[in-house]
Amino acid sequence: VENIRSKNDLGVEKFVGSWYLREAAKTMEFSIPLFDMDIKEVNLTPEGNLELVLLEKTDRCVEKKLLLKKTKKPTEFEIYISSESSYTFCVMETDYDSYFLFCLYNISDREKMACAHYVRRIEENKGMNEFKKILRTLAMPYTVIEVRTRDMCHV
């Protein structure tokens, strides 16, 4: 993770809204199903944290909420996932209008890591090359997950 460079600054208020998962990559040690979900909405809390409302596909679509707590670094947030541990959610790249890329890694075990590419519109492909560049910097083996949008819950 040390060799991955994130954005220097972030306008968190520009993330508000819906995002669709386009593709993801995760290490073998990463077991959280976060990357099987679209983001129904991103909300900014009064404290400057981000609240994600996710749509999880099980036998039906279920809403889940995650709170991303701001840190001293403007592009990083801390997230606690029950039955797991604390993770750092790091925004790697975005143009705010069409795509954003982030990586999520375990604070105590950096081998547990995943990165994802989200888009504003289902048919959007912007950010694909930037996502591939990030994947080339990963030091550990990973699996790429291609998302079939028909299998996802839609906003």
From Swiss-Prot:
Keywords from the named record: Disulfide bond, Milk protein, Retinol-binding, Secreted, Transport
A Pfam family per the record: Lipocalin
Family listed: Belongs to the calycin superfamily. Lipocalin family.
Known role: Lactoglobulin is the primary component of whey, it binds retinol and is probably involved in the transport of that molecule.
Protein species of origin: Macropus giganteus
Subcellular location: Secreted
Main localization category: secreted
Disulfide bond positions: 61-153, 103-115
PANTHER family for this protein: GLYCODELIN (PTHR11430:SF117), LIPOCALIN (PTHR11430)
Top-level taxon in the UniProt lineage: Eukaryota
Keyword Glycoprotein on entry: no
Subunit structure: Monomer.
Full protein name: Beta-lactoglobulin
GO cellular component annotations of the record: extracellular region
InterPro entries: Calycin (IPR012674), Lipocalin (IPR002345), Lipocln_cytosolic_FA-bd_dom (IPR000566)
Keyword Transport: yes
Alphabetized GO MF terms: retinol binding
